[in-house]
Curated annotation (Swiss-Prot):
Gene3D superfamilies: Arginyl tRNA synthetase N-terminal domain (3.30.1360.70), HUPs (3.40.50.620), Isoleucyl-tRNA Synthetase, Domain 1 (1.10.730.10)
SUPFAM superfamilies on file: Anticodon-binding domain of a subclass of class I aminoacyl-tRNA synthetases, Arginyl-tRNA synthetase (ArgRS), N-terminal 'additional' domain, Nucleotidylyl transferase
Reaction equations catalysed: tRNA(Arg) + L-arginine + ATP = L-arginyl-tRNA(Arg) + AMP + diphosphate
GO molecular function ontology, one term from the record: arginine-tRNA ligase activity
Record protein name field: Arginine--tRNA ligase
The UniProt record lists the keyword Mitochondrion: no
Subcellular location: Cytoplasm
Organism whose genome encodes this protein: Pseudomonas paraeruginosa (strain DSM 24068 / PA7)
Pfam families: Arg_tRNA_synt_N (PF03485), DALR_1 (PF05746), tRNA-synt_1d (PF00750)
Phylogenetic classification of the source organism: Bacteria, Pseudomonadati, Pseudomonadota, Gammaproteobacteria, Pseudomonadales
Amino acid sequence: MKDTIRQLIQQALDQLTADGTLPAGLTPDIQVENTKDRSHGDFASNIAMMLAKPAGMKPRDLATRLVEALPAHEQLAKVEIAGPGFLNFFQDHIWLAASLDRALADERLGVRKAGPAQRVVIDLSSPNLAKEMHVGHLRSTIIGDAVARVLEFLGDTVIRQNHVGDWGTQFGMLLAYLEEQPVDAQAELHDLEVFYRAAKKRFDESPEFADRARELVVRLQAGDPDCLRLWTRFNEISLSHCQKVYDRLGVKLSMADVKGESAYNDDLAQVVADLTAKGLLTEDNGALCVFLEEFRNAEGNPLPVIVQKAGGGYLYATTDLAAMRYRHNVLHADRALYFVDQRQALHFQQVFEVARRAGFVPADMELEHMGFGTMNGADGRPFKTRDGGTVKLIDLLEEAESRAYALVKERNEQRVERGEEPFDEAQLREIGRVVGIDSVKYADLSKHRTSDYSFNFELMLSFEGNTAPYLLYACTRVASVFRKLGQGREQLGGRIVLEQPQELALAAQLAQFGDLLNNVALKGVPHLLCAYLYELAGLFSSFYEHCPILTAEDPAQKDSRLRLAALTGRTLEQGLELLGLKTLERM
């Protein structure tokens, strides 16, 4: 709908340019937003205020001319001028109802991608191996997964790339520690975190051990068979830990998506050679660097992008450049999204620019750093265990499931007290599992990607507010309508007719699902989908309260309201699935 309104506004602008009202050469970015108060219409634009000055007119006068020039359209009932010159657009109720009937009949709910389909690389999760995933890996994993799901739903070809850290000093530490311990790796490495911490302690305390670790890294990089064999085993064990976390989280990541740093080892020398051939490299204290004039430090000196250390070693930038070239040349990506901590913003700005100057990626390939804030504890400080250690992600998920189980068990006892049929133990365990994992994920996804947030079990497990339990309950509420009806959602007849304010408000929200998903895909911000679903659930609650469904006044009204309920249920379920959340029929 927003695209339609933009096109209508553009046609009006063209007409006003042709008749001399507007000067030639204007190319405004036409903004169309949802109104906050639907009594002021469904959509609004400030285009008249944007162009009033170049037109030499008062905003309201220009708004009047724009309304006069707007072509009629079946989707619009009327356009009004508000305040200093806003254009408020009101959807036609008959057209809106018919569009929802079409959405209900469509397995994709009438959602279409705005623009051509693309091949999109999603760089997500990417933990360092040799130790277990911790809470700091949650955001990249689930935000990247949600955006990937939305892009796929819209028709893009999505290629997930788990750029794990499977090379470097940490493996030298583990190899050196393994030399000192007469143990079997298979037996001892089941708790990789304990083994890693012990190796790190030796590395920090013993200069001799640290030197040995660095020596073993060199041997590993030179292809020493024994080092490679143990390195491979470390990676297998570490990746198996990661996969357990991914499965527990319900994210679409598998071993086939792993493309670690080591995969680009053979390309790094060529990256340096190509940068040299392009005249981009400068030697600085023995290191090979690219200096970009637009990136300077506080003293005004250009900041280096180091691609090879003085000793010959390579850095993250070198590997990232090799990966970008691979993603263009081999994966044929039109767009690459990097879900990495926003503290790496400067790094990505620099390597993106180097990649373009070197010709590793073309000018029209979209490279976007989807930075995110940090997850803190309830006290606002970095999330730690009680003894100050790093919280394993798997431990956090287990605690979430345990807390959710206790919560649903308590609510089950309340069902018994009310004389309702209780859930059995297996059902309670499954509900607790879904509620626990969904709550952790939704609490994160519902925050703006770039914001820091405080992790709080009590808030995220609440059945009130913008939480997973609230939305899961909304889904079960819709499902209960059809259980009472004794009929499936796919068997509905009749058509949608919009009469009551609550019906219109719910319908208007449902009609925006496609625009909303396209916005999430464009900006990489799942919190918009969370906010949409939360508002949809609230509007359904108001509709449910004020518009009797099963006891409607006549069969036509009953059919219409059942169809609205069915479309609401499907939209809630589809939206939650795109966020990577499970749903429940009963809870």
